[in-house]
Amino acid sequence: MTKNKSKNKSNNSNISNNNNNNNNNNNNNNNNNNNNNNNNNNNNNNNNNNNNNNNNKNGESQLKNKNKNISENQHIYDKHNHDHSHDHNHDYDDNNEDDEEKEELEHYQLIVSTLLNYSQYSLHWVKDMQDFFHYKLSEDEKKLLPNYNAKMEALARAVLVNSQFLKKIGNEHCNIFSQSSDNSANSERIVDPTNLDHIKIDYFMMDQLKSTIRQLVREWSEEGKLERDQAFEPIKQQLLEIYGHIPFQERSKIRVYSPGAGLGRLCLEIASLGFSSQGIEYSFMMLIVSNFMLNKVEKINEFKIHPYIHQTVNVLRDIDQLRTVTIPDVLSSELLPKNNPALEFSMSAGDFTKNIEENSFDCICTCFFIDTAPNILEYVDCISKILKPGGTWINFGPLLYHHAKKKDSIELSYEQLRYLICKKQFQFKKEEIRDAEYCSNQKSLLRSIYKCQFFVVINNKPT
């Protein structure tokens, strides 16, 4: 679950959604990384999906990144929303600020271009396999594979189905708007979807996109319910055990924070219980896709995707590789509580260790997240600071440590981690080891089971 190296800084991007606005959207529009994917890219998928990864009481679905505004539903970028506290230096440098904004815009362009270029990349991949068959195999060998060409043609058709969906997401983000002083929006196209030939495909970013497609199955399909039940349900049940005595309409005063929010489903599920829920996700790719799933989908099972076509190993039957999955299994507008204007639901982009607001949350939920840290001591310290005195930290996930091959990384045993947590004035209330999968292909010949640490601790720092 190594962090995707997104150029956007903490607090630069925000998707928010609360009960009031979702009701309006529903009435008017009906809108609103630990990955073993069972192929040779197992760790890559985790790296892309679960990484360090604001509250907006107006409730409009928003994606914030400086002063650029993208998409249609008043996705406002606020230049003054950038938090400089992460470097403990509040001196303003126009040149540095301009450089950062340029880098962020370039990274954003790269992500949108990747979404729009998926078919170009993937059809080339299919052609490479076809060329190997036609030019590298002997005629006798070809006769042994009479259905191979038909499979390649089916893969190409599946690529186009995926591309149709991904282009919908990319096209939503081709335009950004600069908010002028008189609040008028000046359109500025950052990517021209009709002119992509000059854009070089970034293969690392394309791997992130393929990983994100599989993440859609985990978070937004009926097939993903098995994994959600394994990982999300224990967290939700624990929230209800701790705060369930609070009347539903009053639970919005309990603020729950979810670092490594991925595609937003866990944050949405937490909000569905009546809690104010905020997620933070480091990958801008994930944030853009989650924005679409939370705010742009109009009906259940609206889209079909072929999430496993790029998995060429551990395949039992060709039909398993080519199969479709429909998304979403729910609409966010249907899960969010009605008639509760105090409830806040938001997602922001950035590194949660660089966006510290001390004593600001009642509960922190980490799911397949803490082992994304190169320095897990920093994670524990930040969690302690962010929680209010007496606040609760609920964790579910393994200790895969995806920075382990790098020299600047520290990997603790659970025994060492537990000692560290206690020394940071946390008190353990529950400890279990539970089995869970992560973005597994249910039809694959290889599926990995994680032994996950599920614990609940109370922050006993002084008030």
Swiss-Prot record:
EC category name: transferase
Binding, carnosine: 371, 402, 450
Pfam families noted in UniProt: CARME (PF07942)
Reaction equation(s) it catalyzes: carnosine + S-adenosyl-L-methionine = anserine + S-adenosyl-L-homocysteine + H(+)
UniProt region (Disordered), positions on chain: 1-64, 79-104
Bias (Low complexity): 9-58
Gene3D superfamilies linked to this entry: Vaccinia Virus protein VP39 (3.40.50.150)
Keywords: Methyltransferase, S-adenosyl-L-methionine, Transferase
Record InterPro entries: CARME (IPR012901), SAM-dependent_MTases_sf (IPR029063)
Gene Ontology terms, MF aspect: carnosine N-methyltransferase activity; S-adenosylmethionine-dependent methyltransferase activity
Start-end of Acidic residues biased regions: 94-103
SUPFAM superfamilies recorded: S-adenosyl-L-methionine-dependent methyltransferases
Residues involved in S-adenosyl-L-methionine binding: 215, 218, 260, 281, 351-352, 367, 379
Biased composition (Basic and acidic residues): 79-93
A Gene Ontology BP annotation from the UniProt entry: carnosine metabolic process
EC code: 2.1.1.22
Function summary: N-methyltransferase that mediates the formation of anserine (beta-alanyl-N(Pi)-methyl-L-histidine) from carnosine.
UniProt family annotation: Belongs to the carnosine N-methyltransferase family.
Protein name: Carnosine N-methyltransferase
Organism: Dictyostelium discoideum
